[in-house]
């Protein structure tokens, strides 16, 4: 007689005890975006993620699909991150100048009005002018400090040729890379994926109309299943995607 727990195991929430055992013994793997996001995040966030991956040392594995997608997109992500950094600096500088200019104009208008008032002493007006002018300079200095933080040694300095993040990824996953599919195997998987996509069966059916990497999520899922079965171990997949498929 069939067991409900065995038949519908995928639909039954696991207990806290089972979760604890999984975290203690399972293999950790990541999707492509987790690796690429290391170039997009603030350096401190990147360090924390890499430290978290390192804490699983001896229990990590990287699928061939993710490694392929990572190296295909790495250079573009690095260059895009650099462009975003420059754009951020320019926005801060522009906003600072705009605020300083607006305050100075308002201050000049105020002082002109006070100067025409004979009941107010020139000394008081000069003191007010010097004090308020100092505040506008403080705004400019604050902007400079923010930009220095953008461009300081704390900011991840990465180029396609000089890449400490890549070195760390290799150090963590180097000897734990999964196998690729053979040509015939991949052709058969594409046939299966097409049928699944027609019936909105995850993973990956939302990518059906993509021109590039249409079956990437499905290939990753298949490689994880094969690895878990081969090693007879649970696998934890860390992903930053939030798509329904």
Residue ranges and their predicted role:
Residues 4-235, 243-245:
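Active-site-proximal, substrate-binding regions of enzyme catalytic domains
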Residues 240:
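Charged catalytic cores and adjacent phosphate/nucleic-acid-binding surfaces used
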């Amino acid at each position: 007689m069939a067991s409900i727990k065995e038949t519908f195991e995928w639909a039954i929430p696991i207990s806290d005890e089972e979760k604890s055992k999984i975290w203690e013994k399972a293999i950790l793997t990541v999707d492509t975006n987790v690796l690429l996001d290391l170039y997009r995040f603030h350096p401190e966030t990147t360090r924390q993620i890499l430290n978290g991956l390192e804490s699983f040392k001896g229990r990590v594995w990287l699928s061939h699909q993710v490694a392929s997608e990572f190296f295909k997109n790495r250079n573009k992500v690095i260059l895009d991150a650099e462009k975003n950094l420059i754009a951020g600096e320019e926005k801060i500088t522009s906003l600072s100048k705009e605020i300083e200019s607006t305050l100075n104009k308002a201050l000049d208008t105020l002082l002109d009005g006070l100067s025409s008032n004979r009941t107010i002493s020139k000394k008081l007006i000069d003191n007010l002018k010097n004090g308020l002018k100092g505040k506008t300079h403080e705004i400019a200095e604050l902007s400079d400090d923010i930009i220095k933080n953008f461009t300081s040694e704390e900011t991840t300095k990465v180029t396609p040729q000089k890449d400490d993040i890549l070195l760390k990824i290799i150090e963590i996953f180097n000897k734990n890379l999964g196998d690729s599919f053979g040509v015939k195997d991949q052709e058969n998987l594409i046939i299966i994926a097409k049928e699944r996509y027609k019936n909105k069966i995850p993973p990956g059916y939302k990518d059906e109309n993509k021109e590039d990497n249409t079956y990437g999520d499905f290939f990753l899922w298949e490689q994880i299943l094969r690895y878990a079965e081969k090693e007879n171990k649970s696998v934890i997949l860390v992903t930053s995607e939030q798509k329904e498929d």
